[in-house]
Amino acid sequence: MSEVERALDVLLQEAEELCIGSSVVELDRIPTALEFCREFYSKNQPVVIRKALNWPAIGKWTPKYLIEALGDRSVDVAITPNGYADGLATQNGQEYFVLPLETKMKLSEVVRRLDDPTGAVHYIQKQNSNLSVDLPELAADLRVSDLDFAQQSFNKPPDAVNFWLGDERAVTSMHKDPYENVYCVISGHKDFVLIPPHQLSCVPRGIYPTGVYKTSDSGQFYIEPLRDEEGSDQFTEWVSVDPLSPDLAKYPEYARAKPLKVRVHAGDILYLPNYWFHHVSQSHKCIAVNFWYDLDYDSRYCYYRMLEQMTSARSG
């Protein structure tokens, strides 16, 4: 065992003993800003707040209501053959990191497509503050003051407020984000698999050529490689393992990961701290809204960057 591997091993052991439990903490009430900051934000620990939201959106945002109120509204939609927007797929023996086919559609048409289990998978998941940009009328059904505990702790407004709508085939493959994520489920449920940042060395990652889904004249999906202005292939680092069915023979390091699993129901809030790996699946026609807050680039970020370099040095 190298000195780097020994140091990473110490980190895994001590973090397991001191920091992370075997399940995500659950609360039955919204915490004060002080409680949230002290117990979760400052410790980079996730928490689920059960039945926290008494918003008009809960119960109101049905597919029928969305069609009647905003059915003619044009929205960005991600389309894939398998439900994995921003994920790995293979074509002609080559594995790619693949972006979805993105297009504009009427909201009513998206909802209709969700009831076709044999067709392509349509998912409203544009992470550009699409609720504010495409569906601003829906903001009136959110009582964002319920999230003051988070905003006061982060001491900043959200960078983006995103609207999510898809069927049970839509999956978000495992990844991490440089954001504090306050995730609110409006209808249905979301299933999260979470891995803390200190387990970075347990999560296998690879560098993959980047592609995007396209459709042929016959409607068949294919992957078109992305290239830069000089014609060179583009590449993306991405998590190699599927946490729902990990190939431990191929990725033995993942055996040391200790994923946390949690189901977030309608009316629940999940606080997902920055740089936590997460994989997300969902129920049919699940609707959610999440609030992204940029992370503070403080000493914790510096330590995480050091961990990235140590993990790379071990692999290299």
Curated annotation (Swiss-Prot):
Residues given in the record as succinate binding sites: Y123, Y183, K190
Residues modified as Cysteine sulfenic acid (-SOH) are: C19
Chemical reaction(s) catalysed = L-lysyl-[protein] + 2-oxoglutarate + O2 = (3S)-3-hydroxy-L-lysyl-[protein] + succinate + CO2
Q: Which residues bind 2-oxoglutarate?
A: Y123, T172, N181, Y183, K190, W292
Gene Ontology cellular component terms for the protein in this record: cytoplasm; nucleus
Cell location: Nucleus; Cytoplasm
The record's section on Gene3D superfamilies has:
Jelly Rolls
Keywords per UniProt? Cytoplasm, Disulfide bond, Hydrolase, Iron, Metal-binding, Nucleus, Oxidation, Oxidoreductase
Q: What is its main location?
A: nucleus
Q: What happens when the gene is disrupted?
A: Viable. Adults possess disrupted circadian rhythms displaying reduced daytime sleep. Adults show decreased tolerance buildup following repeated ethanol exposure.
Q: What's one Pfam family here?
A: Cupin_8
**What SMART domains does its record include?**
JmjC (SM00558)
User: What EC number is given for this enzyme?
Assistant: 1.14.11.63, 3.4.-.-
- Residues that hold Fe cation according to the record: H175, D177, H278
The biological process GO terms on file are: circadian behavior
Q: In which tissues is it expressed?
A: Expressed in the pars intercerebralis and fan-shaped body, regions known to be involved in sleep.
Question: This protein is called what?
Answer: Bifunctional peptidase and (3S)-lysyl hydroxylase JMJD7
